[in-house]
Amino acid sequence: MKTIFINRITLAAIAVVFSAFLFTSCQKENSTSGTDALTADQAADFADESTQADASFSDVEDLGMIAAEEDGAASTGRGYHPLFEELRLRTGACANITVTPNDSTYPKTITIDFGDGCLGPDGKFRKGAIIIHLTAPIRQSGAVATITFRNFYLNRAHIEGTKILTNLSSGGNVKFTVQVVNGAVTFPNGRGWQYDELKAVTQIDGGTTPFVRDDVYKIEGRSRTALNGGATLVLNTETPLIKKVVCPWFNNGVLKINANSHVMFVDYGAPNNGDCDNKALLTWNNGANSRLITLP
């Protein structure tokens, strides 16, 4: 059984921040750029890259949560034995995983170092390091995981910023808020995006077992991407995104993307009806136009 506790002060504080973020995002949804009007094709190109930026930070969150969960489950009657078996299924053997201090006490830091880069079993190329600071076991209400980077690349896109996961579980319901501060993604083509998000993550399956692989989460909220010197796009969950830990990508759910007067949708369940794959369908012009997106 995965154990959870309650921290009402933290819950209230995060709720206020989350509400403020949503209010600000709503204000900006209909005026997402101060630059010249975008063409439909430009908006689609930007939506494609914004979706990839969003998915890049989701991948980091995925690895951070898996590492934190396996660390929290590592303490047994015979000592502290983190095996990171599930994490290794994603990163492969090339990542150097260290825990400091290497025992069952907190706070602690987990570092996943990919060195000069390698291709993981999930088909993703990673380089540099992901650093996870934990204040407490991640399943404890009020626990905070702060994720930072050291020269980190995902599929040759440079990822920067700070990602903060806060456990707000109560009454048997496992829930986290996820926030990105000063995020940035620079693609190999040189185009750079600023990125911020605030989302609610709720566990909807797997919570009654000690295993990580059967966990399934529902994600709701907003994110924003701002092209350096250009347009700003707002990404809102039209229908909740569904994420199975066993799959490296979202399985279902729809994002609504606003870019100036253009409204687009990203369907993670299409085109393969929710199968585990790195594809999503971007549509615009009321569905008259579409593009298949390859996710990192």
Q: Where would I find each of the regions flagged by the language model?
A:
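Bacterial N-terminal signal peptides that target proteins for export
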Residues: 2-13
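C-terminal, active-site-flanking charged/polar segments
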Residues: 14, 27
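Alpha-helical transmembrane segments
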Residues: 16-20
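C-terminal motif of bacterial Sec signal peptides marking the signal peptidase cleavage site
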Residues: 21-25
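Low-complexity, intrinsically disordered segments exposed to solvent
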Residues: 28-296
